């Protein structure tokens, strides 16, 4: 550095250079430090959690048993509870109400006073004030002293002091409504499932507290109630619902008086090969564990060692067991309440309070060992499970050593099937995992060999959910994949030697391709989770259609994209004549067609519950509601059915007749002497899907109540229903073009595969992410495990949602 540069730096660095961010300005300047990532949605949802945590703290103190979270139509969120209500008195030091202090100043609140809250997860005045700072507006209502108080903030700034808006109110509690700042968050749309997961978690951890989640954003109001009296024991049973437990739950509930630390523990071993331990401190999840997790692991190992020594079972073991062996198949929820917890970061993902370790370790060791001694039969089953794990680990070790010795003698240890790339930098290298040699050959020809490697997998891929670790290592396909990636798995897992930073699963669009993709995802989730956590795992999105018009070609991802293309290709040459006079063209016609497309989607969704053609004709005549049961609707109903009977392409063109009863309507026709009947129940008309169809039909009712003539490229068509209109336009759009549907990757040539799926500048990739670990755990166990009942229930619950089934 030159002398001039030194002088410049010295002169510019003075007292004036030190900027002090006052009030909540610091939060708005660096929101990520306080609320988490503002781009990926985690920080946005943390806004809700911060407010809910304060209500939970009221519950922990014994003053609250009902919490309500409402997602409002305008995009705001309301969180209310029936606790004591935030204090409203004037704060002596600040000269404003305590409520305003809490909402506008960091590090101000009741959690710093040990008399107000013995245990707390969030900090009033840190959490809530941050929410206020990061909201476009926030409204606070407090019910306290038989009065209702109100105050509103804009971007964290008080509009007017706290005021009394109602008196003689027999109610206590707090209600916070906030609208996230568009300038802070990339996306301000809340995800119902993400919130549902966290609230369910809190309900399990706080037995006896009822939490309501209400979503008012859509026409169908969604409401979920969480209330569990079984506590964390019920939580473990919920997490492990798709596995076989080998013994009843072990429950530990104790408090260390001197430190004020309390412990709740529910644990059982199941017949799976994976451990699942959830750790919480003051209701906050620690994804990276901490001192409580270390203490638990140490205590469990000590319990098993001590029990083996006491009973003499250690003499029967073939191999020494490790800590990992003791936790194979374990499912545990560990919850500690700590008066003044210390975490490694603002996100509280790791507990570092050293005083927690001895309390947890001693309590777990004492209570679990006591349970083992009182339940010798169950204890013996657990020991057998652990010894089996030790034997499998030893077998896996020998298999690895054999593989290493074999590899050391070979010039190259890369699998022969792998067509590797020339690049040695993992950051730019990609590995495509493809199904079979046929697709593999095409992919090898079409790839960019500089950065893209191709690995074809042939034969049946092992379902690792049902296989031991040693059996998995002996699988040819899994072994080939592990070798190609350059890394080992499980205990030896490290991403340092990973040869590709994009691992892309590329399978066919049929049922076999979906199955292979699921098996591969199961392997990566179970044995290479860091690959997913780092964002290295992707799923390719090959097109389903190729459209050729003259010399031009276009690839389309799915059925919806094809439909949109066909509509757009004809819209400029299309007009709709209403009652022989008025005509719809251009934007107005496009708007109608968009509505018809939406209407068709609603009909498709409801078609599993009632006949589609009848639903449509009733809806566009304003009869797919309770009006159909009114006596005066008879003539309109018969007229609608006459229209349906006369439609040329109607599958129900068999002289459909109707018979009305008090609470049901029978639609019937005779075919080959047999009576075919479809029954519409009065109560069915209250189903959300049916109400949605009825209401949406009103937006196109005026159009379809007229006589319609569709003109496409000079050709005229009489149309009556929305489906007829849409199908006519689509069929006209197909004329003069060639549409090819790809069933598998092998049907494409190398150039097509490059243009659609391999070319980094044109392709679409789906990145695999796991947002909620225990929910993912449940899904993989349900779909890929060996317990049939949860899978049967899952299929029954979701079967009607399947639109296209490949069988």
From Swiss-Prot:
GO CC, alphabetical: chromosome; cytoplasm
Alphabetized Pfam families for the sequence: DNA_gyraseB, DNA_gyraseB_C, HATPase_c, Toprim
Domain Toprim: 429-543
EC numbers: 5.6.2.2
Coiled coil (UniProt feature): none
Keyword Transmembrane carried by entry: no
Catalytic function, reaction form: ATP-dependent breakage, passage and rejoining of double-stranded DNA
Record's keyword terms, sorted: ATP-binding, Cytoplasm, DNA-binding, Isomerase, Magnesium, Metal-binding, Nucleotide-binding, Topoisomerase
Site for Interaction with DNA, residues: 460, 463
Enzyme class, first EC level, given as a word: isomerase
Localization (cell): Cytoplasm
Record's keyword annotation contains Transferase: no
Cofactors demanded by this protein: Mg(2+); Mn(2+); Ca(2+)
Residues binding Mg(2+) 2: 508, 510
Cofactor note (record): Binds two Mg(2+) per subunit. The magnesium ions form salt bridges with both the protein and the DNA. Can also accept other divalent metal cations, such as Mn(2+) or Ca(2+).
InterPro entries, per database record: DNA_gyrase_B_C, GyrB, HATPase_C_sf, Ribosomal_Su5_D2-typ_SF, Ribsml_uS5_D2-typ_fold_subgr, Topo_IIA, Topo_IIA-like_dom_sf, Topo_IIA_B
GO BP annotations listed: DNA topological change; DNA-templated DNA replication
HAMAP family assigned to the protein according to its UniProt record, in alphabetical order: GyrB
Primary role: A type II topoisomerase that negatively supercoils closed circular double-stranded (ds) DNA in an ATP-dependent manner to modulate DNA topology and maintain chromosomes in an underwound state. Negative supercoiling favors strand separation, and DNA replication, transcription, recombination and repair, all of which involve strand separation. Also able to catalyze the interconversion of other topological isomers of dsDNA rings, including catenanes and knotted rings. Type II topoisomerases break and join 2 DNA strands simultaneously in an ATP-dependent manner.
Family per record: Belongs to the type II topoisomerase GyrB family.
Binding partners and assembly: Heterotetramer, composed of two GyrA and two GyrB chains. In the heterotetramer, GyrA contains the active site tyrosine that forms a transient covalent intermediate with DNA, while GyrB binds cofactors and catalyzes ATP hydrolysis.
More details: Few gyrases are as efficient as E.coli at forming negative supercoils. Not all organisms have 2 type II topoisomerases; in organisms with a single type II topoisomerase this enzyme also has to decatenate newly replicated chromosomes.
Protein's UniProt name: DNA gyrase subunit B
Classification of source organism: Bacteria, Pseudomonadati, Pseudomonadota, Alphaproteobacteria, Rickettsiales
Gene name of this polypeptide: gyrB
């Amino acid at each position: 550095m030159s002398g001039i540069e030194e002088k410049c730096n010295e002169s510019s660095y003075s007292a004036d250079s030190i900027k002090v961010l006052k009030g909540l300005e610091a939060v708005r300047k660096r929101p990520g430090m306080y609320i988490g990532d503002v781009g990926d949605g985690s920080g946005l949802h943390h806004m809700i959690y911060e407010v809910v945590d304060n209500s939970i703290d009221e519950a922990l103190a014994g003053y609250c048993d009902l919490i309500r979270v409402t997602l409002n139509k305008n995009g705001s969120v309301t969180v209310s509870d029936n606790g004591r209500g935030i204090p409203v008195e004037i704060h002596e030091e600040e000269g404003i109400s305590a409520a305003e202090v809490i909402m506008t100043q960091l590090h101000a609140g009741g959690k710093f006073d040990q008399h107000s809250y013995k245990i707390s997860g969030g900090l009033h005045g840190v959490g809530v004030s941050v929410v206020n700072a990061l909201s476009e507006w926030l409204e606070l209502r407090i019910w306290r002293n038989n009065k209702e108080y109100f105050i509103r903030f804009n971007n964290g700034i008080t509009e007017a002091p706290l005021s009394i808006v109602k008196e003689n109110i027999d109610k206590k509690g707090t209600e916070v409504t906030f609208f996230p700042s568009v300038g802070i968050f990339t996306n301000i749309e809340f995800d119902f499932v993400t919130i549902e997961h966290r609230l369910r978690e809190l309900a399990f951890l706080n037995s006896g507290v009822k939490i309501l989640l209400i979503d008012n954003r859509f026409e169908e109001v969604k409401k979920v109630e969480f209330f569990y009296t079984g506590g964390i024991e019920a939580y473990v049973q919920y997490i492990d619902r798709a596995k076989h437990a080998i013994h009843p739950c072990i429950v530990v509930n104790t408090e260390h008086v001197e430190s004020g630390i309390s412990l709740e523990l529910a644990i059982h071993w199941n017949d799976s090969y994976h451990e699942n331990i959830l750790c919480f401190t003051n209701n906050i999840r620690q994804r990276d564990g901490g001192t409580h997790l270390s203490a638990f692991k140490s205590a469990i190992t000590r319990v098993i060692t001590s029990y083996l020594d006491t009973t003499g079972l250690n003499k029967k073991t073939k191999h020494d067991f490790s800590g990992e062996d003791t936790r194979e198949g374990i499912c545990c929820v560990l919850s500690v309440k700590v008066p003044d917890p210390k975490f490694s970061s603002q996100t509280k993902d790791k507990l570092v309070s050293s005083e927690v370790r001895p309390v947890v370790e001693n309590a777990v060791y004492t209570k679990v060992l006591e349970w083992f001694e009182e339940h010798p039969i169950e204890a013996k089953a657990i020991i057998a499970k652990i010894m089996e794990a030790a034997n499998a680990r030893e077998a896996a070790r020998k298999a690895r050593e054999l593989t290493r010795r074999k590899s050391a003698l070979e010039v190259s240890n890369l699998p022969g099937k792998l067509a590797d790339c020339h690049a040695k930098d993992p950051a730019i290298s990609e590995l495509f995992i493809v199904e079979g040699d046929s697709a593999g050959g095409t992919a090898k020809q079409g790839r960019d060999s500089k950065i893209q490697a191709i690995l074809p997998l042939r034969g049946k891929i092992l379902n690792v959910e049902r296989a031991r670790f040693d059996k998995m290592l002996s699988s040819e396909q899994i072994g080939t994949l592990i070798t190609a990636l350059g890394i080992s798995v499980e205990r030896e897992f490290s991403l340092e030697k990973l040869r590709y930073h994009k691992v892309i699963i590329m399978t066919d669009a049929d049922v076999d391709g979906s199955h292979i993709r699921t098996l591969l995802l199961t392997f990566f989730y179970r044995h290479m989770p860091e690959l997913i956590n780092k964002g290295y795992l992707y799923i390719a999105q090959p097109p389903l259609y190729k459209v050729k018009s003259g010399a031009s070609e276009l690839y389309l991802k799915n059925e919806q994209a094809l439909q949109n293309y066909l509509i757009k290709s004809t819209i400029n040459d299309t007009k709709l004549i209403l009652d022989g006079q008025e005509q719809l063209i251009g934007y107005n016609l496009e708007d109608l067609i968009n509505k018809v497309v939406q209407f068709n989607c609603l009909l498709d969704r409801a078609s599993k519950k009632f006949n589609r053609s009848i639903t449509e004709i009733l809806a566009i005549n304003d009869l797919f509601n309770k009006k159909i049961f009114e006596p005066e609707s008879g003539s309109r109903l018969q007229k609608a059915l006459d229209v349906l009977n006369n439609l040329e392409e109607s599958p129900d063109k068999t002289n459909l007749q109707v018979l009305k009863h008090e609470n049901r309507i029978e639609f019937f026709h005779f075919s080959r002497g047999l009576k075919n009947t479809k029954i519409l129940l009065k109560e069915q008309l209250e189903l959300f899907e049916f109400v949605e169809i009825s209401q949406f039909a009103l937006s196109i009712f005026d159009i379809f109540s007229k006589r319609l003539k569709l003109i496409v490229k000079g050709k005229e068509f009489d149309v009556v229903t929305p489906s007829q209109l849409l199908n006519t336009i689509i069929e006209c759009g197909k004329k003069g073009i060639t549409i090819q549907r790809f069933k598998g990757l092998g049907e494409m040539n190398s150039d097509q595969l490059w243009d659609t799926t391999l070319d980094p500048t044109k392709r679409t990739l789906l990145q695999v992410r796991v947002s909620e670990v225990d929910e993912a755990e449940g899904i993989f166990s349900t779909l890929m495990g060996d317990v049939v009942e949860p899978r049967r229930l899952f299929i029954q619950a979701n079967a009607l949602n399947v639109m296209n089934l490949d069988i």
